[in-house]
């Protein structure tokens, strides 16, 4: 897992315009990026739950929220923006993947002074739960309209990352879901909602790759991390959102060809971030005693132990066996040139990620599965690095195979050339 400090995130997003589009889950994605651009700390539970505030960590509420009225209707609006000397991050709250409001957002991005460099987007839960019984079919049609317009409006240098909807809990108590009251649709069951989310993720993945956009499968990454869910069964705690930010930043670095630093996963600065999966309100920093003081932001690597632990008994040396006769000389073998072993896939270490193909697994349709992410530090392992240099990359679905352009300033979303088909050569009869 790639772990980044605030100074490194500032360098990666230097002079970049990042746009986040989505619901309340992606509002927390926006907040964690804004926080990580300024300091090395996590979001508090209060910051995660608050919506529509006038200011958050030096950002500004541009429209909606507390400037208008806080409610849970489908016409809720909230636009936030964080702007510094070299960074610009903007958030648009969406209740539907494509609508008249989404069209106005696209026109605003197209006519603005700065074209977006990165767009992080997801819209699913509101679409499949608040727009009637045929919401899934309309969601599929809206996906086609959205990605078609994105392909027309966005410049080829813009990196669009579509996030799949994250897993849901067994008990859902989110406030935006429809209630059993007069004039509204009946409350959807948890099993039905989970099934709709799975189908919606499949449709969005297929439509995004059809238009050569990237897909980050958050449903896969967090499928076994439900202990980091909030009590409502929809939103996630600060540890999960920091993991999510790392995945997004590693995806951007891989797309731009930026080499990220290789950091020891056992650094104490990151141990504290992932050591807890509880969802409790954290105490202020003034109440923390000296024994719980946080580690410095730039810790030194932990040296390996020189002597065995005093609590463990020292094993005696093994007994020597009977002396063996000297080996007989072998006849000389003919010398042949050494054949190196080549593999079609690059070799990755256990603490690195890889980019897998788009071929679906045999057990699940439309998704590829790998090893789980660990939210707790693992026992230290000896660091044996191969002689060759290897890049870290997140597990992502690529809309097209990796293509290396000729020049350094080629567009990002350029479609690969189709291979030319040659006529089959005539088969000649072999001499008997």
Curated annotation (Swiss-Prot):
Chain spans, region Disordered: 273-312, 407-432
Superkingdom: Eukaryota
Skewed-composition ranges (Pro residues): 296-312
Comp. bias (Polar residues): 285-294
Alphabetical list of InterPro entries matching this protein: SGNH_hydro_sf
Family stated for the protein in its record: Belongs to the PC-esterase family.
UniProt-recorded name of the protein: PC-esterase domain-containing protein 1B
Source species of the chain: Rattus norvegicus
Originating gene: Pced1b
């Amino acid at each position: 897992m790639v772990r980044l400090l605030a100074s490194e995130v500032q360098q990666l997003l230097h002079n970049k315009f990042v746009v986040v589009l989505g619901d309340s889950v992606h509002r927390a994605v926006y907040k964690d990026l804004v926080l990580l651009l300024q300091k090395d700390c996590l979001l508090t539970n209060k910051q995660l739950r608050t919506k529509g505030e006038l200011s958050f960590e030096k950002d500004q509420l541009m429209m909606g929220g507390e400037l208008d009225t806080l409610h849970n209707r489908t016409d809720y609006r909230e636009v936030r923006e964080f702007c510094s000397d070299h960074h610009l991050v903007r958030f648009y709250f969406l209740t539907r993947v494509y609508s008249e409001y989404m069209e106005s957002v696209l026109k605003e991005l197209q006519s603005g002074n700065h074209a977006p460099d990165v767009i992080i987007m997801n819209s699913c839960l509101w679409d499949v739960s608040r727009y009637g019984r045929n919401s899934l079919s309309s969601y599929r049609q809206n996906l086609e309209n959205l990605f078609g317009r994105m392909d027309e409006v966005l410049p080829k240098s813009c990196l669009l990352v579509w996030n799949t909807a994250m897993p849901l809990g067994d008990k859902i108590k989110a406030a935006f879901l429809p209630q059993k009251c007069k004039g509204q649709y009946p409350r959807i069951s948890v099993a039905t909602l989970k099934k709709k989310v799975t189908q919606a993720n499949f449709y969005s993945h297929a439509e995004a790759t059809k238009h050569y956009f990237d897909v980050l499968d958050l449903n896969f990454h967090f499928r076994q991390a439900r202990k980091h869910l909030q009590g409502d069964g929809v939103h996630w705690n600060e540890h999960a959102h920091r993991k999510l930010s790392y995945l997004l930043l590693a995806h951007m670095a891989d797309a731009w060809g930026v080499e990220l630093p290789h950091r020891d996963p056992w650094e104490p600065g990151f141990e504290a971030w992932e050591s807890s999966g509880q969802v409790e309100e954290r105490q202020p920093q003034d109440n923390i005693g000296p024994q719980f003081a946080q580690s410095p932001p730039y810790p030194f690597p932990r040296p390996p132990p020189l002597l065995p632990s005093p609590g463990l008994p020292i094993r005696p040396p093994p007994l020597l066996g009977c002396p063996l006769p000297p080996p007989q000389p072998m006849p000389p073998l003919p010398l042949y040139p050494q054949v190196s072993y080549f593999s079609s896939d690059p070799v990755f270490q256990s603490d690195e990620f890889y980019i897998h193909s788009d071929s679906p697994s045999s057990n699940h349709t439309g998704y590829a599965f790998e090893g789980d992410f660990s939210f707790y530090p693992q026992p230290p392992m000896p660091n044996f690095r191969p002689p060759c240099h290897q890049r870290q990359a997140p597990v992502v679905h690529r809309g097209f195979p990796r293509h290396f352009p000729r020049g350094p300033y080629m567009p990002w979303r350029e479609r690969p050339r189709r291979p030319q088909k040659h006529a089959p050569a005539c088969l000649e009869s072999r001499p008997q």
